[in-house]
């Protein structure tokens, strides 16, 4: 008598974990992750060692201590991480035709997407955590306390990293080639949106509340006490006449809401596009 053995397929959650694990292994094999962490740690060590070596004492305030180290490079680091781990996450499956091996498996496309995004999420959390907690702990050793403002900035940086990754996945799900997705993501976050923020806000007088990079300004503004506020200044120009400049300051509560909105909307749209996208073309 023949015995039929049926094998139960893993649940969606188990498959998400599997995709996440293999995606992280892929980044380890390509040395992207190791390279990012090495660059991050070397930069952090330099930022900690150079000031006292050139005769500049550390700030005595724990918030200023952390801000003096993290504020210059936080958003740049996040943009680099998003470019490396989110921008080509989907498009590379089509460009390299690896989707022919991946997509026929009994795994839902949304499961593949969520597994990949979870790996990027974990990498972003790791990178931002190292970037913040080394100076936070160093500040504890130097000043004797930990600033709650530094913790709040850390939380905002995490949220921005996840939101920027979501935008990167959306771009990756649309673009045909990985190079185009990488270039567009990098310049969108580092140049295009910030320039747009300046034109619309500083010169146009309209607060760019829709902009992810504008709301990311709260990462650094949160260190200031009291928290800064928006203002308008009028400057006389040679030859007569005045020029008005607007300085808009994003509010923390609004920034959190906008970033969460980016995370939800960008991922939902990206999943829909990814599910409908075919290998041909």
Residue ranges and their predicted role:
Residues 1-38:
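Aromatic- and glycine-rich beta-strand/loop motifs that create alpha-glucan
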Residues 2-5, 273-281:
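Short, charged juxtamembrane terminal tails flanking transmembrane helices
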Residues 2-10, 38-40, 44-89, 114-185, ...:
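Secretory targeting signals
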Residues 26, 92, 105, 136-140, ...:
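Transmembrane helix-loop junction
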Residues 50-65, 190-273, 281:
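Terminal transmembrane helical anchor/hairpin motif
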Residues 86, 97-98:
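Hydrophobic alpha-helical segments typical of transmembrane helices
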Residues 101-108:
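Short helix-to-coil transition segments within interhelical loops
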Residues 108-110, 114:
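Alpha-helix N-cap/start motif
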């Amino acid at each position: 008598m023949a015995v039929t053995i049926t094998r139960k397929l893993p649940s969606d959650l188990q498959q998400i974990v599997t995709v996440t694990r293999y995606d992280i292994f892929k980044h380890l094999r390509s040395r992207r992750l190791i390279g990012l962490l090495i660059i991050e740690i070397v930069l952090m060590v330099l930022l900690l060692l150079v000031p006292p070596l050139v005769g500049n004492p550390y700030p005595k305030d724990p918030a200023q201590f952390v801000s003096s180290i993290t504020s210059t490079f936080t958003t740049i680091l996040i943009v680099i991480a998003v470019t490396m781990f989110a921008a080509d996450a989907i498009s590379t499956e089509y460009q390299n035709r690896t989707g022919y091996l991946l997509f026929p498996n009994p795994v839902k496309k949304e499961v593949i997407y969520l597994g990949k995004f979870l790996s990027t999420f974990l990498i972003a959390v790791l990178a931002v955590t190292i970037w913040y907690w080394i100076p936070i702990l160093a500040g504890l050793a130097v000043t004797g306390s930990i600033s709650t403002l530094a913790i709040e900035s850390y939380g905002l940086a995490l949220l921005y990293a996840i939101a920027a990754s979501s935008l990167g996945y959306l771009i990756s799900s649309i673009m045909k080639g990985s190079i185009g997705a990488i270039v567009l993501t990098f310049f969108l976050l580092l140049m295009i949106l910030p320039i747009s923020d300046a034109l619309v806000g500083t010169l146009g007088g309209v607060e760019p509340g829709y902009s992810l990079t504008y709301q990311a300004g709260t990462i650094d503004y949160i260190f200031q006490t009291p928290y800064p506020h928006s203002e308008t200044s009028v400057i006389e120009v040679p030859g007569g006449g005045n020029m008005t400049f607007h300085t808009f300051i994003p509010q923390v509560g609004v920034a959190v809401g906008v970033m969460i909105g980016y995370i939800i909307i960008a991922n939902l749209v990206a999943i829909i596009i990814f599910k409908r996208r075919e290998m041909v073309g």
